[in-house]
Amino acid sequence: MSGALRAFTIGLTAFLTVVDLFATQAILPALTVSYGVTPAAMGFAVNATTIGMALGGLLVALFGRSIDQRLGILLSLAVLAVPTALLATMPSLPVFTLLRIVQGLCMSTAFALTLAYLGEHASASDPASAFAAYITGNVASNLFGRLLAAGVVDHLGLAANFWVFAALNLGGAVLVWFTVERTPPMRQTDMSHGSPFASWLGHLANPALRAAFGVGFLILFAFIGTFTYVNFVLVRPPFAVDMMMLGVVYFVFLPSVITTPLAGRAVARFGTRPVLWASFAVAIAGLPLMLSTSLAALLLGLALVAVGTFFAQATATGFVGRAATIDRGAASGLYLASYFLGGLSGSAVLGQVFDRLGWTACVVGIGIALALGALLATRLIAAGHRADAASAFQIARPSRHGGTTS
């Protein structure tokens, strides 16, 4: 397989693995009307996938070394089609929430095992390009998944949307069947001899890793708060965009598809902390624009938030993989759990702020989260120059991430 085809296949696998994660955000207004609930309630239900994503990351960190990676990825994507299809029945809100959690569990397991597979089998000359392709596919799913969901709902309705995405899940399983080679369980070249829980305690005792986990929490907190509740702003006056246009709005992710693969080079040249500070500064610069009554200004603000948070995510995940000195899989599992719990918290907390105080207060909350992330970034100094010199995409080595999704 040529390098370009291999990169495309890796990116497409990432796309089909996490396309369900954020695509449903684009149809939040339609779901809110259909269920007759508040934006905060529907936002929490839709973003409940983050609970499953967090659990999946931890489970793979615990048991991933004994799992056949190809079989695990294949089954996760095939099973993912089941809760996705059941969502088409438009169940009660609690059941909807539970099905989203199951979706998250399946996605996270496939995501983590795929990254582990790449870490084990990417050649020594191109691991960064393999991880960059996977992360870029993840970013692309944020754009094209939302665009697809909005278009299907606009033309065929809510139920058809979930049937289409179930078909995509099965397509991902088929792709894995034909492109991922069978492998033995993960090698344990970088494992401590203690239990995974002992490794977790060791990681939590590391101030730099604790700070990195906090940075991840705050990144998705801000990202979810932005791209969940801005949908309700866009469908109301003065913008009043329709469902199809709401999907088109998410072309604001296109710059991120271009910039995110550059994170590794930026870290190698400038270091982790400066890159994180610059990333958070870019995201914060977009916040005032998100309060504008001009659609163009609002979209520019969203694009800046997307570029900043995706770049920060690539940088922070890379730091965790390099800074952990033992059991990097466990460190990555803890990071993923913190990252996705941040998304769930952002959905819940900023949803209540949006319902009670409005969009301006919600944006202020997003700004506070981003500022705290920049502050925590000052503590990412573990492993010195060695950690900063490596590519930001080395997170996935199991002998060292287990999602984002942002």
Q: Where are the predicted features?
A:
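C-terminal transmembrane helical hairpin of 12-TM major facilitator-type secondary transporters
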Residues: 273-316
